[in-house]
C-alpha cells in the first residue's frame, strides 16, 4: 500500500510548496523509493489551458495531452518521472465530475453537498494516482494558502484521508514563512504560529514544518516554533533562500526532511545517493564559460510564462559547463525600438510559443535579424510559425504572407488551421495536445542533434505549416527536417547555410531534464558558445 504526504502552505502565496514537493520527491527517489506527485489546484477552471499566462504562468503539457500547472514541470524535472493528467486536479474538474455524476443519477436522490460528495471525489482522485501509478509514496501538494476559502474542500478531504487509510500511512508537511524584520533585526514566528493555528482549526496537525527564511534559523527560534506549534523540534525544517531551485533538495537533505518523513511513515530510512545531483549543482555554480541567450516573447513581464524554456536552457548549459544568462525581451519592444538595439550583442535567441497577434511583428523582425546576421536561433511552436512568415515575406516572394490566425484575409496563409480544428467551437482542451511521433530526415541538423530517425515530442497548437506552400519553400532554400510519420504535418524547419537556425512546431522544452538536456537546446548553447568565440557575428544577407 502506498504512503501519502500532504504538503500545504501558509502565510503567503508562492511560498515554494511546489519546489518542496519536487525536492522531497527527489530525496525519496535517491533512496530508491518510487514517487508520484499530485497537484490539487483550488481554482474553478477545469484546467489552466485557457488562463492568461500573466495570471497563471506557463501551461505545462504532459505526454498524454493534459494542460497542467507549471509545478508539474518541477515534478518531472526533479524526479525524472513523467506526469500525466492524473497528476493535476482542479476544483473545476472536481465539480464537473460531481455534477456529471449527479445528472447521471449516481447519487440516487441524495442532496449533493461539499461533504461528503465533493470531498469523496477529491479523495478518489488521490487514490487513483496511487492505484494507477503504484508508487511507494504519493506526494500531494495542495495549492493556495491555508485560510483561503477556495482550499477548504481540499483541506477537509486530506483531513479525512488519514482516518481512511490509517495514521501511519499519512504525513502532513506545512510550508510556512519566518520573516526577518530588518529594522528590528529579528525573525518573527507569529505568522507561522497563526498559520498552524488556522490549519489545526480545520483538524490537521502538521507533522513537519518547512520554514522559509532569509537567514539561518537559530536553535531558539526552532524551539519556539516547536513549542507553540506542537511539532518536535527536529521536525522544524529550515529552508533558507537558496541560490537556485536545484540547491533546495540538498538544503532539505541537510536539514533531514526526508528522514523525518520516512520516520513518520514507518519506512526504512535508506541511505540517499545524491552524487549526480551534487555534481549538477556544482556545475551550476562553477561554470567554465558564459553565454547570454535572449528570449523574445509576448509574456516576458512574467517570466514564469516561459519557465520550461528557461530551465531547458540552463540544463543545456549544465551539460556544457556553461552559465546561461537570460535576457528577457518583449516582442512589442522589438517593434518599438528595432531588433538591432536589443539583440546586437547576444549569443543566441529563442522565440517561444504563444497565441494571438499582439507582438507578432516583433517576433518576425527578430527572426529576420538573427537569420541575416548568423545569430544562433531556436524557434518553438509560434516561433516556428513566425520563422515561416519571415521566409515567406522576405525570401519566397509572398507579399503579405501571414498566419490565418493573425490575418484571415492574407493572400498567402503560409500557416493554416489544422483540418481537424475547423469545426471546433470550444477553446478549452481542444488543441493538438500531447506526445506525437516525428520522423527526422537524414543529413539534416535535426538528425545530427537527435541522432535518431523517429522522436517523440509534446505539442500544444491549433495551427500548422500550410502544405500548399511546401514546394515553394523547399525550392527557395528551406529545409523541412521533421515531419509527422504520414508526411502530412511539418514539425521541424531549418536553414542549412546558417550557423544554427532551427525551429519546431512542438515544445521540446517540456522534455528537458537537468541530467538529460534536450538535444535542440544543447545544440543552441553549443552554437552560442561557438558564436561567442568569434570576433564578431557572421553577416549573412538573405540566407538560409
Swiss-Prot record:
Associated pathway: Pyrimidine metabolism; CTP biosynthesis via de novo pathway; CTP from UDP: step 2/2
Residues annotated as binding ATP: 14-19, 71
Binding site for L-glutamine: 54, 354, 382-385, 405, 462
Claim: S-adenosyl-L-methionine is one of the keywords in the record: no
InterPro entries with a match to the protein in the record: Class_I_gatase-like (IPR029062), CTP_synthase (IPR004468), CTP_synthase_N (IPR017456), GATASE (IPR017926), GATase1_CTP_Synthase (IPR033828), P-loop_NTPase (IPR027417)
A Gene Ontology term for the protein's cellular component: cytosol
Regulation: Allosterically activated by GTP, when glutamine is the substrate; GTP has no effect on the reaction when ammonia is the substrate. The allosteric effector GTP functions by stabilizing the protein conformation that binds the tetrahedral intermediate(s) formed during glutamine hydrolysis. Inhibited by the product CTP, via allosteric rather than competitive inhibition.
EC assignment: 6.3.4.2
Residues that bind UTP: 13, 188-193, 224
UniProt catalytic activity: UTP + L-glutamine + ATP + H2O = CTP + L-glutamate + ADP + phosphate + 2 H(+); L-glutamine + H2O = L-glutamate + NH4(+); UTP + NH4(+) + ATP = CTP + ADP + phosphate + 2 H(+)
Source taxon at top rank: Bacteria
Positions annotated to bind Mg(2+): 71, 141
HAMAP family: PyrG
Additional observations: CTPSs have evolved a hybrid strategy for distinguishing between UTP and CTP. The overlapping regions of the product feedback inhibitory and substrate sites recognize a common feature in both compounds, the triphosphate moiety. To differentiate isosteric substrate and product pyrimidine rings, an additional pocket far from the expected kinase/ligase catalytic site, specifically recognizes the cytosine and ribose portions of the product inhibitor.
Family the UniProt entry places it in: Belongs to the CTP synthase family.
Subunit structure: Homotetramer.
Entry-linked PANTHER family: CTP SYNTHASE, CTP SYNTHASE-RELATED
Role: Catalyzes the ATP-dependent amination of UTP to CTP with either L-glutamine or ammonia as the source of nitrogen. Regulates intracellular CTP levels through interactions with the four ribonucleotide triphosphates.
Protein's name in the database: CTP synthase
Annotated organism of origin: Synechococcus sp. (strain JA-3-3Ab) (Cyanobacteria bacterium Yellowstone A-Prime)
Amino acid at each position: 500500500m502506498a504512503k501519502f504526504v500532504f504538503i500545504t502552505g501558509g502565510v503567503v502565496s508562492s511560498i515554494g510548496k511546489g519546489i518542496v514537493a519536487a525536492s522531497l520527491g527527489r530525496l525519496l527517489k535517491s533512496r530508491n523509493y518510487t514517487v508520484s506527485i499530485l497537484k490539487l489546484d483550488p481554482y474553478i477552471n477545469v484546467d489552466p489551458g485557457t488562463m492568461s499566462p500573466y495570471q497563471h504562468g506557463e501551461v505545462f503539457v504532459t505526454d498524454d495531452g493534459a494542460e497542467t500547472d507549471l509545478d508539474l514541470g518541477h515534478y518531472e524535472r526533479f524526479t525524472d518521472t513523467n506526469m500525466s493528467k492524473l497528476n493535476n486536479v482542479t476544483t473545476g474538474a472536481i465539480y464537473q465530475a460531481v455534477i456529471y455524476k449527479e445528472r447521471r443519477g449516481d447519487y440516487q436522490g441524495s442532496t449533493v453537498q461539499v461533504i461528503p460528495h465533493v470531498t469523496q471525489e477529491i479523495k478518489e482522485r488521490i487514490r487513483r494516482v496511487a492505484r494507477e501509478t503504484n508508487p511507494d509514496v504519493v506526494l500531494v501538494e495542495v495549492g493556495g494558502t491555508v485560510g483561503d476559502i477556495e482550499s477548504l474542500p481540499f483541506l477537509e478531504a486530506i483531513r479525512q484521508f488519514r482516518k481512511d487509510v490509517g495514521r501511519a500511512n499519512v504525513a502532513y508537511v506545512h510550508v510556512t514563512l519566518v520573516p526577518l524584520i530588518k529594522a528590528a533585526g529579528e525573525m518573527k514566528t507569529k505568522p507561522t504560529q497563526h498559520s498552524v493555528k488556522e490549519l489545526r482549526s480545520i483538524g490537521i496537525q502538521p507533522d513537519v514544518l518547512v520554514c522559509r527564511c532569509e537567514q539561518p534559523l537559530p536553535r531558539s527560534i526552532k524551539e519556539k516554533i516547536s513549542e507553540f506549534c506542537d511539532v518536535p523540534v527536529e521536525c522544524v525544517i529550515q529552508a533558507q533562500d537558496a541560490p537556485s531551485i536545484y540547491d533546495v533538495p540538498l538544503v532539505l537533505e541537510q536539514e533531514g526532511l526526508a528522514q523525518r518523513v520516512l520516520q513518520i511513515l514507518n519506512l526504512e530510512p535508506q541511505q540517499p545517493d545524491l552524487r549526480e545531483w551534487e555534481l549538477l549543482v556544482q556545475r551550476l555554480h562553477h561554470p567554465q564559460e558564459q553565454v547570454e541567450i535572449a528570449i523574445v516573447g509576448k509574456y516576458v513581464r512574467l517570466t514564469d510564462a516561459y519557465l520550461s524554456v528557461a530551465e531547458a536552457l540552463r540544463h543545456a548549459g549544465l551539460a556544457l559547463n556553461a552559465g546561461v544568462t537570460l535576457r528577457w525581451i518583449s516582442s512589442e519592444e522589438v517593434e518599438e525600438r528595432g531588433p538591432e538595439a536589443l539583440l546586437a550583442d547576444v549569443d543566441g535567441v529563442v522565440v517561444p510559443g504563444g497565441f494571438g497577434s499582439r507582438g507578432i511583428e516583433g517576433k518576425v523582425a527578430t527572426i529576420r535579424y538573427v537569420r541575416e546576421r548568423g545569430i544562433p536561433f531556436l524557434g518553438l511552436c509560434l516561433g516556428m510559425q513566425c520563422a515561416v512568415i519571415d521566409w515567406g515575406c522576405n525570401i519566397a516572394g509572398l507579399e503579405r504572407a501571414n498566419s490565418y490566425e493573425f490575418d484571415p484575409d492574407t493572400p498567402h496563409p503560409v500557416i493554416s488551421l489544422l483540418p481537424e480544428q475547423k469545426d471546433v467551437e470550444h477553446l478549452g482542451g481542444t488543441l493538438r495536445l500531447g506526445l506525437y511521433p516525428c520522423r527526422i530526415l537524414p543529413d539534416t541538423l535535426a538528425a545530427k542533434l537527435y541522432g535518431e530517425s523517429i522522436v517523440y515530442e509534446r505539442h500544444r497548437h491549433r495551427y500548422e505549416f500550410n502544405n500548399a506552400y511546401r514546394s515553394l519553400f523547399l525550392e527557395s532554400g528551406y529545409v523541412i527536417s521533421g515531419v509527422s510519420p504520414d508526411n502530412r504535418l511539418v514539425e521541424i524547419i531549418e536553414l542549412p547555410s546558417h550557423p544554427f537556425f532551427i525551429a519546431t512546431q512542438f515544445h521540446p522544452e517540456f522534455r528537458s531534464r537537468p541530467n538529460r538536456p534536450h538535444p535542440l537546446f544543447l545544440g543552441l548553447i553549443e552554437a552560442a558558445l561557438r558564436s561567442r568565440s568569434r570576433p564578431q557575428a557572421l553577416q549573412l544577407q538573405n540566407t538560409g
